[in-house]
Amino acid sequence: MTTYSSREEIDEQYRWDLSSIFESDEAFLAALEEAKKLPPRFASFQGKISASAAELLAYLKLDDEAGLILTKLANYAERKSDEDTRESRYQDYSSQVMTLWVSLSSASSWFTSELLSLSEQEMEGFYSQEPELELYRRCLDVIFSRREHVLSPAEEKLLAAAGDMANQPDNIFSLLNDADLTFPDAHDAEGAAHPVTHGSYIPLMMSADRTLRESAYESLYSSYRQFRNTFAATLGAQNKQLKFFAEARRYESALEAALSANEVPTQVYTNLIETVHNNMDAMYKYVALRKELLDVDELRFSDLYVPIVDDVELTFTYEEACDIILEALRPMGENYLALVRRSLSERWIDVYETPGKRSGAYSAGGYGMHPVILLNFQGKLDDVFTLIHEMGHSIHTYLSCANQPVCYSDYVIFVAEVASTCNEALLTRYLLDHAKNERERAYFLNHFLEQFRATLYRQTMFAEFELKVAELTAQGAGITADALCGIYKELNAQYFGDGIALDENIALEWARIPHFYYRFYVYQYATGFAAAIALSQRILDLGEQGREDYLGFLKGGSSKPPIDLLRGAGVNMLSPEPVEDALKLFDEMVDEMAEACRKLKAEKH
């Protein structure tokens, strides 16, 4: 893969076009100056929206206007900064936008309390007086549904002031984990040293050299063991602040407080855990297959990342990757494909790595601009999956914005991962159907099974750990390193079964997971994955009906609660069925993998 020393070396077609946001820095700065006039306009409505339907409507229209311009300002500043993170000008632009966002939040902090001073009867009167308010009924209903959890203005101000303090467990964890923690070198079978970092750990764990894998595994956890009590204190503090805010807002639990923000019933969370518990056999079968294929006497946690199909070197040019995703997405229909082609021809995508460019990949966008995708394309299979994944987010954003008014154009995280993972599921099916030989097919199966294990099983285990720690905190129990290690080790025993050797290192894994500071976030990876598998299967099985239902979901934005949007697409996340169906597919794929590997073994002999 060609390496580039600057963006100017890259052909324009591989660099994103941000002109749909702002034509130039000058246009951005002019819009920013104009937007700085917004906070006083918000503040001027205080005391008026509860007295007049016309004033409430004017406020909501102003809120739409502000959301539009702030989204464009933030996108331009952040996208330009990500082109070269060393460029201080765009860091300054981002900082100015964030400052403005904080000012706007402060200038409008009174809104919810004042709105909730209106009775249901008064609100209905407002709808009669100003028919245009009907557009905002769902937005307002969501706020009214949380009436019992909103406090007095003085209490709200106090909770807001505590917000920065509540973020400190995450901040301390990040500094300890990312800045202060170092790891001893790992050594391979020849005795050569290999540096261990957060970035190098997984590549080392994928090495065919078992000595190196075990050394890297021991290296990583030796450092976490040294600071286990500090990590326990940060996680304990995180759970205490969640408990404090949940109780202050009169929620029954920290879980309910977190999920209510996305209108997701706690039943979805507990249902996920229960359904996975009832379908562990497929995971145990996969663990046994991995042990057999690696030909080891004892499967260890240091053996989980090494590929079980070797000798497959797949590389792709960017053009080949684009051709593959267009073919894989053919079941989505011509309208969807036309948008994908537009994204490729109209420069929505920033393709190649350059010095200073932000690492990783993402899709970003919003009302009034086309979405954009950042890649660091290296030509590996994972890069093809990344492209189709981010394309799923971008088309979701485009369709939501094209079919909803500003106030409903965004969508919550609970449904976001569905759109991206559905695309990945279609790519997996396409690759399996077009594998050139049995070895390539086994390689694709291995890729899918690992993705499945890491997403549905692993994230559900994480979700269960979060819930158990929250329940301990609610009981007033001490959150000690020993208690956390005990819970985590027991969960690993349950999720992996007898087919793997439990050790004291894996009991410490909780200490290195940043998502445990994200407030009951990880379950959405698992539910999103299950929903995506179900929807991709519907699209393949039902053809046009499945496709139209799915496109309706993508166009829905936040016009309905996420559970209702998914139900409209044909998936009921309140039932165990989507998770059960996904786990059934995993079970079938494990059998396919075993059969493919048996054929490969027979070919060798």
Language model feature labels by segment:
Residues 314-316, 349-369:
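Catalytic zinc-binding patch centered on the HExxH motif and its immediate surroundings
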Residues 1-311, 596, 601:
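A well-structured
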Residues 314-316, 368-388:
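Short pre-active-site segment immediately N-terminal to the catalytic Zn-binding motif
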Residues 327, 331-338, 364, 393, ...:
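Conserved helix-loop functional segments at active or binding sites
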Residues 293-331, 337, 371, 396, ...:
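Long, K/E/R/D-enriched contiguous segments that form extended
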Residues 372-376, 403-413, 442-451, 470-472, ...:
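Short beta-alpha connecting loops at secondary-structure transitions
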Residues 385, 397-421:
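Post-HEXXH active-site segment of zinc metalloproteases
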Residues 8-10, 23, 111, 115-118, ...:
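C-terminal, non-catalytic "cap/extension" segments appended to globular domains
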